[in-house]
Design a protein with these regions (language model features):
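C-terminal nucleotide
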Residues: 2, 39, 47, 52-65, ...
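Anion-binding (especially nucleotide phosphate/pyrophosphate-binding) glycine-rich loop
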Residues: 1-53, 187-190, 195
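Structural motif
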Residues: 211-213
Length: 220
């Protein structure tokens, strides 16, 4: 706000989800706040410009060990494939999905709050340290998960939501192996129970929410 030279204003924020869920709330909040402040000054920012500014605040100014995906997802929206380049550029390409695929996702994606909330910074910092230290296993894991992302894009654009669910399961297994703090026995039990009762795949979202992809069959 100081860099924006905004006149004295009062800001009040309300949220339906608790802090520490890891659902990208900090990136979304920063992006939305910047958009509101620039809008107050009657200045329009392009989506990419807004996302980069939000990244600057969180990563450069606040020193948070986060990536750019949350800010870009908040600024651009929709189902989008993001490519993060070595030179710090970000390319955003909207997925080409049929209406049937969108309806299928709406019907079968369920988000459960596990009751756990924490800061994801510790896990992300550990991951960032290993990556920058050229940890072979971590780099191999990240490259494989990147390929899973491209496979998920192809599955969705071809309308194969079952394959998407299976890829989500594979993604979770690899993500969980990065750190002992990524999951816990209780969450693992809930995940296994869901898989035994019709879920095709799922993953823990950030630090608290559990996203499960269920089969199209009727569920209780």
């Amino acid at each position: 706000m100081q860099s924006l030279k905004t006149p004295q204003i009062e800001i009040t924020t309300l949220a339906d989800i608790p802090a520490g869920t890891g659902l990208g709330s900090s990136g979304s909040f920063t992006t939305a706040l910047l958009k509101a402040l620039y809008g107050h000054r009657r200045q329009h920012l392009h989506q990419e410009e807004l996302a980069e500014l939000a990244c600057h605040v969180e990563i450069d100014r606040l020193g948070e060990p986060v990536g750019k995906q949350d800010q870009y997802a908040a600024a651009i929206g929709g189902l989008t494939c993001f490519t993060f380049h070595r030179d710090d550029r970000v390319t955003a390409v909207p997925l080409k999905l049929s209406m049937d695929t969108l309806f299928d996702l709406e019907d079968n994606l369920l988000l459960f709050f596990t009751g756990y909330s924490r800061s994801a910074s510790g896990i992300l910092k550990d991951q960032d340290t290993k990556t920058k230290g050229s940890d072979e296993e971590m780099l191999k894991n990240l490259h494989y998960v990147k390929e899973l992302g491209y496979q998920s894009k192809s599955a969705l654009e071809s309308g194969n939501t079952t394959a998407f669910g299976e890829l989500m399961h594979t993604h979770w297994l690899h993500k969980k192996s990065r750190s002992d703090g990524m999951s816990n026995p209780k969450i693992d039990d809930w995940y296994d129970l869901a898989m035994q009762n019709g879920a095709i795949g799922g993953k823990l979202v950030g630090a608290g929410g559990c996203l499960l992809y269920t089969s199209p069959s009727p569920r209780d």
